[in-house]
């Protein structure tokens, strides 16, 4: 019997994502000037205010206000009517030094004996449902919003009313074998200008103006946004876009008040959007604002790297990887594998886990080195998903009034998405 599964995403202008991006921009700034920085930075955003808090150990001095304002401006909060604007909002910092008790458990004379920054379990997941080994409902949800943001920033004349805050949700019908059959429902909620004004102060005139705005936005979503997103996918995914899709565009009827003025945003509140959209599993730890000594982040990336390479190598069509740690201990407590009965090798999931244990060094320092995580690569992860992205080499420049010369870094983004272990896995599993 078929079933429906739903995933959601939020835009870079969503208040929780504004907070995530500020936290990761601060992390990048510290790492650009001091790669050994230990950072745990949280951000709160609300009407006209940004609050920064957390723990840092670094030789770098960062102008946190300047970094926060630059992120807010880059996202697009540049108008006073948003009630949250880059130049005028208040930025309060309560960032202080990292606890010595934590630091003594993390740092070691031999860096490869570096202990995990905390206890916990982390998960990685991959499926052959899409070309990037991600769940399709989540991937579509991300694509809808990243394309909407592209239009807002680069082709404003096409949808000139767009504001930064937005959410999406996609429901897909699957058959018993987990194969997508069709897209059932698409939800788009996008913040917008009040671009149709009522003829007078009567309720009827206000309702008519609101309906005119909603009709225009719904028409643009269906005629402009949906075809552009469809074109990004292979034919088998395009075929899922039928004329039977149910669309809900701004279903409340109006979305003018939004962003941090509409809802308070906090770092780390969109962990399912950040990962697998409800597929697989999540250990509960957020990513943004944390340097790679925090296994909440680094081990989750490493687990995704393992899962993706296992599926790409043909070990299974779907894989969940769990790894767990104790604070101050380098080696993980366990590695667990679940192939959901979709394994392509004559091994139990426990036997697959044993091979994975031998193939991948999951000590925190080994993960940092393998995935090049001691670089300023994190701002780009903080919107539209940490997983399923395209690895790429970029040049990043950091300028601070506290440093005489800019720092220019060549860094590799999304290294955990590379398929660089496929050959080793095939050899190990005899594929």
Model-found features: residue ranges?
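N-terminal, positively charged regions that mediate nucleic acid binding
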Residues: 1-40, 45, 422, 428-431
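Glycine-rich, mobile lid/loop segments that gate access to catalytic sites or pores
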Residues: 6, 66, 73-257, 388, ...
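Conserved phosphate/anionic-ligand binding catalytic regions in large, soluble enzymes, centered on
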Residues: 8-10, 14-19, 115-130, 256-281, ...
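Alpha-helical support elements that line or immediately flank enzyme active sites
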Residues: 12-31, 126-150, 290-314
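A short glycine-rich, hydrophobically flanked beta-strand micro-motif that places a catalytic Asp/Glu
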Residues: 37-41, 166-172, 245-249, 315-326
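Short, charge-patterned binding micro-sites
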Residues: 40-58, 327-331
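Internal helix-turn-beta structural module
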Residues: 46, 318, 325-431
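C-terminal catalytic subdomain
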Residues: 271, 276-320, 331-338
